[in-house]
């Protein structure tokens, strides 16, 4: 194996490892999208009901999004979280202080919720199914797992290439990384489109702002790393095979 190809192979492996770590961290964390709003310092009856609805198993899209808006919510692929006061005061609001303790409460999406239809008017089951948002939601949480699976399968093939001391299997590894990058890019695109469509239907309150979080950024960084790793794997395999063919033809001649 030529030193150039070995160097390209090692660099591609490093890029692949980094992108896999980023993708796994992105899938496992809850900061794809974050909302910023004034923290509700008191725990009135209405606030308690909102928290219970948010943490319930049957919360619809409109219900949990309204709570996310009001309580500094964060949204991941599998969980939704809100920030609420740690100490509740049912009789009266606490005195205003410079800071107070808060706690984060999270609720996981069930598989039924992940595959549940989205409605034209969120929360209104009689408004008809919004097919675009429904399939965008399903793709945004399925594609990252497909991407991660392709990366792991490509790593196994790369390991076989090392054992066989051959660069030929790395062509398949490169193709798998290319497909993984496309899946990651598709997931990010679906997530952005889904968030924008949601905010067109459910407007944010005036004192609430939203932004993409660091989990989303990790997924965005992972995609180009996968593409670069794929390019190096494919280049190393293709060029090495081409030089081997030329060398074989020269020896025959």
Swiss-Prot record:
GO cellular component: apical plasma membrane
One Pfam family linked to the record: Claudin_2
Coiled coil: none
Localization in the cell: Cell junction, Tight junction; Cell membrane
Tissue specificity as recorded in UniProt: In the brain, highly expressed in endothelial cells of the cerebellum compared to other regions (at protein level).
Membrane topology, as annotated: Multi-pass membrane protein
Induction text: Down-regulated in the cerebellum following cerebellar hemorrhage (at protein level).
Transmembrane intervals: 5-25, 141-161, 175-195, 216-236
Recorded domain comment: The C-terminal region is required for localization to tight junctions which occurs in a TJP1/ZO1-independent manner.
Function statement: Plays a role in negatively regulating the permeability of cells to small molecules.
Protein family: Belongs to the PMP-22/EMP/MP20 family.
Name of the molecule in the record: Claudin domain-containing protein 1
Name of the gene: Cldnd1
